[in-house]
Amino acid sequence: SSSGSFFSSDAGALSAPDEKKEPEEEKGPDLTGLALNPLTGLYIDEETALNRPAAVVINNHHKALPQSGIAKADILYEVLAEGEITRLIAIFNDFSAEKIGPVRSARNYFTYFALDNGAVFIHHGGSPSGYEAVKARSVNNIDGMREEGSLFWRDPKRVNMAGMYEHSSYTSAEKILEGIKKYGYDAEDTGIRLFS
């Protein structure tokens, strides 16, 4: 019969053609000049990937809003500071943020976020146990209490508003790099990485 079933021998129209095509080799993206960001696993500029990260304590109180620079952070932790008040620990590998803050004080356990990411710890002041932890754990740090007016500045709009002084300390990526150089800290990646 001329109407064969799929399983019959005359279903030749369904058989594979005689000529075999070689599969085309897929080309991946051009990764020239790129390297893995050790914090995110995403590709970034090779030189940027070599930066040592900075861990900045940023105020998360409702009076501190809006914060500056957090969109440039590679990792953003929200951590309890006291009571129901939280702070952000922003980890930066890319030093392009022009304004970061408001920067707040060190707490004992905040130092672990810097150490775990091989980062320089950036804060403005600290609790007694925060300062003890920085010293006891040999945490490379830049403190706004020592560097106000040079590596840190007060936002003029906030500093003159009632109840806003503690929400007015800022720094920048450029100032953090200046501080790393000033204190003689290693500016290159310390080898602690989430991605490699």
Residue ranges and their predicted role:
Residues S1-G4:
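Sec-dependent N-terminal signal peptides of Gram-positive bacterial secreted proteins and lipoproteins
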Residues F6-L14, E25-Y77, E82-S196:
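A surface/extracellular/periplasmic glyco- and lipid-processing/surface-interacting theme
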